[in-house]
Curated annotation (Swiss-Prot):
Keyword Ribosomal protein part of the UniProt annotation: no
Residues recorded with modification Phosphoserine: S253
Domain of life per record: Eukaryota
Tissue specificity statement from the Swiss-Prot or TrEMBL entry: Present at high level in Sertoli cells, but not detected in spermatogenic cells (at protein level). Low expression in spleen, thymus and prostate.
Record-given protein name: Spermatogenesis-associated protein 2
Organism: Homo sapiens (Human)
Outcome when changing T94K: Weak or no effect on interaction with CYLD
Amino acid sequence: MGKPSSMDTKFKDDLFRKYVQFHESKVDTTTSRQRPGSDECLRVAASTLLSLHKVDPFYRFRLIQFYEVVESSLRSLSSSSLRALHGAFSMLETVGINLFLYPWKKEFRSIKTYTGPFVYYVKSTLLEEDIRAILSCMGYTPELGTAYKLRELVETLQVKMVSFELFLAKVECEQMLEIHSQVKDKGYSELDIVSERKSSAEDVRGCSDALRRRAEGREHLTASMSRVALQKSASERAAKDYYKPRVTKPSRSVDAYDSYWESRKPPLKASLSLRKEPVATDVGDDLKDEIIRPSPSLLTMASSPHGSPDVLPPASPSNGPALLRGTYFSTQDDVDLYTDSEPRATYRRQDALRPDVWLLRNDAHSLYHKRSPPAKESALSKCQSCGLSCSSSLCQRCDSLLTCPPASKPSAFPSKASTHDSLAHGASLREKYPGQTQGLDRLPHLHSKSKPSTTPTSRCGFCNRPGATNTCTQCSKVSCDACLSAYHYDPCYKKSELHKFMPNNQLNYKSTQLSHLVYR
C-alpha cells in the first residue's frame, strides 16, 4: 500500500468533475440537452475509485476522517448502524449540494438542529463533534446550540469537495453493508467490517474472502484446542487410573479365592504313619530332609533289650564328646483322620500307656537308629478279659486296654542332652561290649520318660489296627493288607494323586524329599 499514482489521481479528478456537472445540470436552464435521471454511473465509478488496488485507505478521504467517524458512532450510539450512517451522510450531502447550487437563498444560510429530519437522520446517528466538524468544512458555525449559521463568504469549491466526499462516504457505507451481508454468518459485526475495510486495500470481494478465511482459521483453532483439551482430560483420567492404589483384598475369582483361604488354614498334621517332628533340635546342625526306613538290623536290635552289637559302630575318638544325641518320641501315631470313630480321649489315654522309642544319632556316621529303652521287667501283659498275653497295650483278641506296670520317674535333667553326650557315648560302647561294661543302668537318665519295651508294630492308618505292612512312598502313610485293597482310591495328601504303597521290606533308606523333617 502507498500513495495513489498519477493515474489514480486523474481518475478521482475526473469523477469529481462529473459529479459537479451532474448536479449543476439539474438547475441549468440555458442548455436544451436532457437532464440525467440517475446517478448510477457515478456510484459505479465511485465504487471503482474506492476499490483501487494497493492504495492506502488513508487517501480515500482527505477532508473527512470517514473511518474514525464511523467507528466512534458505532461504539457510542446504540441507534447507529451502517444503514443509518448511509442516511446521515446522504442528508449532509444534500445540505452541501443546495449550498453550492443556491448560495443566494436565505433558507440555506441557516440550519435548525431541532427539526425532525435533522434530529432523526443526523443527531441520532453521528456524534455532535463529528457533525460540527463536517458542517464547519462547509462554512457553518454553531449558534446558541440550536442552529448552525453560514459565514459571510462562501467558498464554493470547498463546499463542492465536501459534498463529493460525503457522496463517497455514502458509497463506502453501501460497500461495507455488502461485505457484512456476506460474512455475518461467521459472527462478524459491522464494527469488524469497518476495521477490516480501514486496514485493507482490497475490494469488496477481497475483504469478504479475507474475513471468511480468518473465521475458518479461528474455527479450526478452536476445534484443535477442544481436541487437545479432551485428550488432556483423557490422559489425566488414564494417569489417575494407573496410579490408583491397588486393592489389597483378594480377588473373588476361583483361583485367588481358594489360594487365599488355603493360606489361612492351619497346617494339617499328618498322623497316619511314622512321621514325627523333633521335640528338641540343634540350630547349628544341617539336617537333611530325608526319611529313615527301618532295616533288618534295626528290627533285630529292637527285639532285644540290649540291641545288636553290629548296629552301632564305634565312635571315633577324634570326634570328641557331644557326638551322640538322643530325642524322645512315642511309638504310636496320632488319631487317624480317616477312620476316627471313637472319642479322642480314648486315644490320648492309650498313647499314655504305650512304650517309648529312642532315636540315637551318631554324628560321625550320620546314621539314625531305632531301639527301645532297657526294661527291668517283662514287657508282656495279660488281658484281664480273655487272659491272652499281648506285647502291646491293646488286646489283639477283644480290643480291650491292658494294664501296664507304672512307669519309672523321669530323669532330673531330661532336656540337657548336651551335658550327657559323653554318658550316651559310653552307654553305646558298653552296649557293644557287654563283657567289659557294667550295663546300661545310666542310660535312662538321658530320657524324659521310660516305659516297658514292646515288640514294635505299626497300626494301619485306615482301620487303626496293628499289623501295618505297607507304607506310602510319598506321604509315609501305613496300611494293612486288608485296607490296601479297600482304600486303593484314597488320594495322597502330599500330591494330587493316589497313594503309592510298597511293602516295608522293600523300602529304601531314602525316599522323595518332603518339606519337613520326618523321623522313623
